[in-house]
Amino acid sequence: MDFVKGNEACFDRNLRAGHLTGSAWVIDQNRSHALLTHHARLGVWVQLGGHVEDDPDMLGAAWREAREESGLINVRPVLDHIFDVDVHEIPANPKEPAHLHYDIRFLFEADREAPLAITAESKSLRWIALDEITEITREESVLRMVRKTVSVARP
C-alpha cells in the first residue's frame, strides 16, 4: 500500500496518478452465484463498485456502491476485512485521461430473489453461477474472486 502512504489525496478521483475505489463482490446465501454488472462505459462484466467519494471507510463505501448500483436493500458483509485488492488501468475517456484504480474489495451477501434495479452505469445486472462466470468474462481479477469465494466457509 505504498500508493496510500505516498498520496495523502488517495481518495480524490481527481488525483491523476490514480485513486482508491471500493468494490463489493456480492454472492448469494448459497455461495453459488455472484452479482455482476455489465459496465456501461468499460463494456465488461465486473463486480459492483466505484469511487469512494472522500469516504475513508472503505467497507462503507463498497457497501454504499453495492446498494446504489443494484437497488438491493438488504446487502450484508460476509467478512469484516478486505476480501481482495486489485490495481487496474481505466482507459482514457473524454472526461479524464487513463489512470489507475487501486480497488479495495469486500465480500457481501444478498438474497438472489430480491428485485434488482439497473442504473445508468450498467448495461445489465445479473446473478451468475460461479461455475459459469468464465463464459462471460476472462477478467483475471473477477476470476480470482470466484476462486476465493470457493474457499469461504458456507453459512
Annotate each PLM feature.
Residues M1-S23:
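Acidic, metal-coordinating catalytic segment for phosphate/diphosphate chemistry
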Residues R13-L15, L35-T37, G50, L116-T119:
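Short histidine-centered beta-strand/loop micro-motifs
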Residues H19, H39, H51, H99-H101:
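Histidine-centered active-site/metal-ligand motif
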Residues W25-Q29, A34-W63:
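Glycine-rich active-site/cofactor-binding loop and its immediate structural neighborhood
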Residues E53-S141:
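Unchanged
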Residues T137-P155:
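Charged phosphate-binding loop/patch that engages nucleotide di/tri-phosphates or the phosphate backbone
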